[in-house]
């Protein structure tokens, strides 16, 4: 199993804080625990598949080795004149120790004659052509196997299968903070026997607890249940899964894929009350892909039209229909605000209260579908999808141009990069206080205007966001033979936020191009033929210059009125130059110049500005 490595660890902490006593009233102690599972594993498919001979040969072909300086091996050949027979074939013994050979024949005057042949063994061939003439035969061994397009495609595909290196990391955290705890701490594992069995218990000390622990503590009388003290029990649970896949389709072409899902949940229980009301909150993030709606530039002359936003509005009726269809056959609960209500226990009736088109249960799936270019009837409805809905981000680099032609005579390095990063996130959410559960995440809340139950999920999600970055969309980094460094890149990013509470979508976009130049003059004193340079110090002069142009724009799109309003926008031009010179082991002098011009797109929000800064800096190192 040399292709597989794995590590698993578990850590738990237990904390006990003594509570105060005020005017004879005990406020109770506070106990808390935290447990963390960490697991990571790595799989090297190349090591695994190298155990198969044919795959090992393919790996050797694509091995990242430098070309040898040894002269190329010359093919051996055999030449001799034979007379063919009209009645039988001719066997020629060439002793080249190679079954793969090329056979040609010519008359005595040099005229080529086509002949048919087959290899007998590594040292002999049989001439199948029959005639009555003298021919000069030339037999040359084939050093390199002749390749076909189909075979090349097959081997590249096999190389793609061999190349992955997969890394998986999983982290699970759980914690519980429980106030109003009466027993005092004990001597062994923090356990006391003064309140019956071990309190708070070894399961608490080692982090193996869930929400049922509070019920057990109440049954054993460990908790103060005075409703004048309302400090809640607080649970936290987090799950994070990261998968990283590294591929190398061919030499120099590297692809890194990343998958991530992070789900954090918090609960607060007021256990001192009879019905023990519980509220929930949390956050959620996953890697996403909105590539099909990316790289769009809304213009003022068409009202900042966005096809994705138009699709979002068009998705709302279909998503609302699908959400409401989940309640078919569901009965109104008989708990919470519905206890004693005439609707309690009755089948769900849309005429009493239906799913609203402006609810987060409808807007969030419609939003994700539109900006991911997914049909509304195929879009998942949950705002917290599982790992099967996680989409990859990627980074691609290629440095193989240096191996083409005479590129090495011009460049030391030549690298092309492209990266795509996108996340879907629920920044924070809370649960409805009056939510009554019907089945799973299906339930009802009270409509304050009509006094009727309306179907909804348990969570009040005010906003979700899709953040996308091409970092860069295209980038080039070059170092010439004379150490001159050149770089250029184009970046594009956007953040699209759905604010369901305000009924709007906010789009913030940023795109820009950067050109850079760098040069390092080693031993600048020597270049100027200056005296006095210190021994062991290279008086290097480093020069850097960057020119960039950046476009920023922010829009608010109203859902109810289908109206778009620009809120801000600027075009920024920047020139930056810096120089750094090493005077001695301890002293470095640097100079900089920066000029920036901002031109507003929305003139009502700002005005044109320009700024210039320049200066000198001295860096004195006092370290020995």
Predicted regions mapped to residue ranges:
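Exposed, low-structure sequence patches enriched in small/polar residues
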Residues: 1-128, 134-624
């Amino acid at each position: 199993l040399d292709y597989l490595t794995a590590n698993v660890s578990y850590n738990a902490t237990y904390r006990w804080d003594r509570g105060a006593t005020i005017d004879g009233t005990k406020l109770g102690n506070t106990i808390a625990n935290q447990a963390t599972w960490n697991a990571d594993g790595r799989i090297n498919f190349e090591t695994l598949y190298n155990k198969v001979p044919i795959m090992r040969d393919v790996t050797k072909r694509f091995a990242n080795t430098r070309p040898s300086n040894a002269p190329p091996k010359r093919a051996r050949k055999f030449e001799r004149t034979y007379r063919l027979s009209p009645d039988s074939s001719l066997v020629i013994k060439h002793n080249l120790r190679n079954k793969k050979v090329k056979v040609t024949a010519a008359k005595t005057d040099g005229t080529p004659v086509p002949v048919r042949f087959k290899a007998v063994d590594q040292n002999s061939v049989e001439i199948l052509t029959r005639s009555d003439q003298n021919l000069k035969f030339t037999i040359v061994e084939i050093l390199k196997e002749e390749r076909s397009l189909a075979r090349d495609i097959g081997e590249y595909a096999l190389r793609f299968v061999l190349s992955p290196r997969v890394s998986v990391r999983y982290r699970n955290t759980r914690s519980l903070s429980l106030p109003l705890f009466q027993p005092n701490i004990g001597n062994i594992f923090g356990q006391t026997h003064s309140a019956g069995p071990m309190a708070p218990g070894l399961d608490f000390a080692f982090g193996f607890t869930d929400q049922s622990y509070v019920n057990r503590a109440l049954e054993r009388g460990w908790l103060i249940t005075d409703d004048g003290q309302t400090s809640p029990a607080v649970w936290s649970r987090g799950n994070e899964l990261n998968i990283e896949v590294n591929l190398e389709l061919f030499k120099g072409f590297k692809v890194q894929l990343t998958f991530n899902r992070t789900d954090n949940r918090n609960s607060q229980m007021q256990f001192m009350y009879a019905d023990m009301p519980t509220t929930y909150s949390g956050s959620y993030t996953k890697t996403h892909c909105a590539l099909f709606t990316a790289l769009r530039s809304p213009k003022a002359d068409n009202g900042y039209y966005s096809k994705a936003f138009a699709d979002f509005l068009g998705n709302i009726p279909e998503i609302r229909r699908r959400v409401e269809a989940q309640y078919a056959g569901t009965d109104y609960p008989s708990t919470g605000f519905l206890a004693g209500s005439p609707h309690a226990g009755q089948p769900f009736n849309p005429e009493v209260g239906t799913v609203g088109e402006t609810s987060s249960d409808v807007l969030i799936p419609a939003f994700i579908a539109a900006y991911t270019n997914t049909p509304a009837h195929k879009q998942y409805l949950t705002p917290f999808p599982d790992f099967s809905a996680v989409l990859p981000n990627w980074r691609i680099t290629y440095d193989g141009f240096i191996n083409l032609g005479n590129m090495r005579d011009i460049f030391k390095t030549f690298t092309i990069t492209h990266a795509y990063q996108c996340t879907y996130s629920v920044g924070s959410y809370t649960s409805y206080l009056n939510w009554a559960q019907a089945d799973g995440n299906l339930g009802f809340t009270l409509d304050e205007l009509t006094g009727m139950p309306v179907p909804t999920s348990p969570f009040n999600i005010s906003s979700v966001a899709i953040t996308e970055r091409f970092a860069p969309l295209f980038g080039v980094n070059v170092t010439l033979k004379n150490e001159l460094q050149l770089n250029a890149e184009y970046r594009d990013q956007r953040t699209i936020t759905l604010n369901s509470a305000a009924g709007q979508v906010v789009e913030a976009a940023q795109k820009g191009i950067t050109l850079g130049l760098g040069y390092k003059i080693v031993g600048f004193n020597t270049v100027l033929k200056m005296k006095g340079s210190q021994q062991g110090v290279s008086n290097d002069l480093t020069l850097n210059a960057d020119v960039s142009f950046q476009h920023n724009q922010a829009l608010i799109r109203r859902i109810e009125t289908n109206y778009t309003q620009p809120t801000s926008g600027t075009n920024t031009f920047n020139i930056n130059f810096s120089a750094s010179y090493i005077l001695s082991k301890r002293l470095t002098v640097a100079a900089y110049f920066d000029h920036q011009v901002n031109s507003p797109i929305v003139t009502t929000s700002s005005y044109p500005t320009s700024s210039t800064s320049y200066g000198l800096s001295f860096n004195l190192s006092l370290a020995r």
